[in-house]
Amino acid sequence: MMVAWWSLFLYGLQVAAPALAATPADWRSQSIYFLLTDRFARTDGSTTATCNTADRKYCGGTWQGIIDKLDYIQGMGFTAIWITPVTAQLPQTTAYGDAYHGYWQQDIYSLNENYGTADDLKALSSALHERGMYLMVDVVANHMGYDGAGSSVDYSVFKPFSSQDYFHPFCLIQNYEDQTQVEDCWLGDNTVSLPDLDTTKDVVKNEWYDWVGSLVSNYSIDGLRIDTVKHVQKDFWPGYNKAAGVYCIGEVLDGDPAYTCPYQNVMDGVLNYPIYYPLLNAFKSTSGSMDDLYNMINTVKSDCPDSTLLGTFVENHDNPRFASYTNDIALAKNVAAFIILNDGIPIIYAGQEQHYAGGNDPANREATWLSGYPTDSELYKLIASANAIRNYAISKDTGFVTYKNWPIYKDDTTIAMRKGTDGSQIVTILSNKGASGDSYTLSLSGAGYTAGQQLTEVIGCTTVTVGSDGNVPVPMAGGLPRVLYPTEKLAGSKICSSS
């Protein structure tokens, strides 16, 4: 059987066991595969078990199922997984279906038995650590979940927050421009209400701080993704982050860097929604704006406390999948390459590698097993190649992860950027011309390479030579991304079969 170069490289690189209590600095070097536990893999290994997203029901994914498919994840070069919340949920099938996603918790001290047992979760953590990989777990501090109207909640079902005293008075958020409403009123509606915990109260705050430290310790968790961060007052978060003792990345669902970036002053990182919107718009069609993306890269770099600790993504369970906008595989390859080679921590959502095309929730929560987990799909291979060069650059250049991505070129259809210390930099050239894009040579200045230097384009495994003027002649065709790295630096790496 022929084994791809990137497979040999990736398995060779990921051998070091993670340190206890993974720090923000440790997480800079990671690449995250995000999955909904219920939708990724089943214990029985089925690739045909029905999962109708419109039903919004449990489909049978488990922690053991994830363990059994870690080869598939690691084969793409990912060094970490992020799984959805593990706490026990409301048990009813509501008008909106089951709490299969994990965001309608009722008992924070019990696990969701649909996913498995405590031993299963510990086994998942151990299996990851044996591979040198990290475990990130999703957590919710803002709210609980109740099957019914907010005005008639039976608070006794919540553990440990078993009385109304722990919660803000019921009111639904009407105006998202009013931060007081955003923090004090409730998400959800009167069909499934999300009772909003009053995190200004010491009894609530202390309970959460004790709980999160225990969760991390009990299951050897390396990092946390925190849901609905903007719905909790900022002064709650530093203590929570400290109590967790690991890297925390928060969901602040807002594309304005002036709103989102300051949350990095109260926790380690946030999901990079400011980049998400211009990134999506640049590549979801062949007429997208490269100007907006170019400008936002620079804005985030200058305005966020540390852009190298943000999470870069274009898909998740809350937003429509990229392929719901366009089925052009070349555009999908470009956006995936950007995610992996931009500043910060790359996040790819399960199914993105198989070009899943679900739109809004619940359509974007497809079962990964129905793809059959092929490892020869176009995007699987592209993601593996991009992760491979990123992982390799990190291993060879101590400054790679803290070097801030520098856009060096743009035109109506192209953006180029460099990241990494002089002599070891990766230069990425992205196009939104799409699969029908023409063939031409881009003369690229500002890459920082030396005249006559040979570069390897690691996606297609071709080489180019830097011109006498220092410009790089980059062959472009079919709208595909190009990723350049000094050929001499690849010796012994197995990347593009370098010996």
From Swiss-Prot:
Keywords: Calcium, Carbohydrate metabolism, Disulfide bond, Glycoprotein, Glycosidase, Hydrolase, Metal-binding, Secreted, Signal
Origin superkingdom: Eukaryota
Residues in the signal sequence: 1-21
GO terms assigned for molecular function: alpha-amylase activity; calcium ion binding
Binding-site positions, Ca(2+) 1: N142, E183, D196, H231
Enzyme class label: hydrolase
Residues of this chain annotated as glycosylated in UniProt: N218
Substrates-to-products reaction catalysed: Endohydrolysis of (1->4)-alpha-D-glucosidic linkages in polysaccharides containing three or more (1->4)-alpha-linked D-glucose units
Cofactor stoichiometry and binding remark: Binds 2 calcium ions per subunit. Calcium is inhibitory at high concentrations.
S-S pairs: C51-C59, C171-C185, C261-C304, C461-C496
Xref: Gene3D superfamilies: Glycosidases, Golgi alpha-mannosidase II
Flavoprotein as UniProt keyword: no
Cellular component aspect of the GO annotation: extracellular region
Residues annotated for Ca(2+) 2 binding in this entry: D227, E251
Classification via Pfam families: A_amylase_dom_C (PF09260), Alpha-amylase (PF00128)
Keyword Glycoprotein in annotation: yes
GO BP terms: carbohydrate catabolic process
Cofactor: Ca(2+)
Cellular localisation: Secreted
InterPro entries, alphabetized: A-amylase-like (IPR013777), A_amylase_C_dom (IPR015340), Alpha_amylase (IPR006046), Glyco_hydro_13_cat_dom (IPR006047), Glyco_hydro_b (IPR013780), Glycoside_hydrolase_SF (IPR017853)
Active-site annotation: D227, E251
Residues that coordinate or bind substrate: W104, H143, R225, K230, H231, G255, R365
Subunit relationships: Monomer.
Similarity-based family: Belongs to the glycosyl hydrolase 13 family.
Protein name: Alpha-amylase A type-3
